[in-house]
């Protein structure tokens, strides 16, 4: 089930984010990420039956997978995005320039990937950015396993910033750090976060992204961000057994 991650609005300053709180939010989401990875595994056909062991070693153990998870997600995505979204001019506006930008960003493919991510994970994230060395905007769908939105602690739950991160382990030193990209309305933080006995340490670079709004958009499949087959996994397991 979707978990709202919050950051206290009182004292919030996008120019001075509290690194220890960012680190804590990442560790909380990293726990949730294991559930999201399991949903992706079911879509890819990696089901519980593949790890099944018979009590009687002489009994057959076929481990056959009927991938209903993929069938459900692909069918739902096909119904939702089988026909690309159409954008039309109105009497009040001319969106030809916008449509040209959408064509350049291959927005139909991004929409389709977002729809599939919603079917699998119950959520999707789209990142808007300027192409390197250019002023044109581009768009891409990014992995929900490594992305989350952070809201304020008010009743309205207004978005404050988005985080895209990945974990880096050093087995020789038995240490773990997180590479994180944090986007507020105006700033892009590049952080390297690690926890030590003396607290959270980090390297940080901050640059303006000049978009005037958080450049990561969150889409939810429903209010609770439940995937299309998430509540059918026990039935899928029973069928495959």
Question: Where do the language-model regions lie?
Answer:
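Extended, helix-rich architectural segments
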Residues: 1-139
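Structured, contiguous alpha/beta core segments that scaffold functional sites
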Residues: 3-12, 16-17, 113-241
């Amino acid at each position: 089930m979707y978990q709202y991650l919050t950051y206290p609005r009182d004292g919030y300053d996008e120019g001075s984010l509290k690194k220890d709180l960012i680190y804590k939010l990442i560790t909380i989401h990293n726990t949730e990420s294991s559930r999201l990875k399991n949903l992706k595994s079911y879509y890819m056909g990696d089901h519980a039956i593949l790890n099944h062991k018979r009590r009687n070693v002489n009994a057959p153990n076929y481990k056959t997978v009927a991938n209903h998870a993929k069938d459900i997600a692909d069918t739902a995505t096909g119904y939702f995005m089988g026909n690309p979204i159409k954008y039309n001019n109105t009497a009040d506006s001319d969106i030809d320039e916008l449509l040209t930008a959408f064509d350049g960003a291959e927005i139909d493919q991004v929409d389709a990937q977002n729809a599939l991510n919603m079917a699998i994970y119950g959520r999707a994230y789209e990142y808007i950015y300027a192409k390197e060395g250019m002023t044109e905007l581009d768009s891409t769908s990014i992995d929900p396993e490594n992305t989350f939105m952070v809201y304020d602690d008010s009743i309205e739950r207004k978005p404050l910033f988005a985080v895209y991160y990945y974990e880096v382990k050093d087995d020789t030193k038995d240490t773990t750090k997180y590479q994180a990209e944090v986007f507020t309305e105006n700033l892009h933080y590049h952080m390297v976060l690690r926890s030590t006995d003396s607290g959270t340490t980090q390297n940080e670079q901050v640059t303006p992204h000049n978009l005037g709004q958080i450049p990561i958009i969150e889409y939810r499949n429903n209010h609770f961000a439940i995937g299309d087959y998430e509540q059918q996994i026990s039935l899928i397991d029973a069928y495959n057994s």
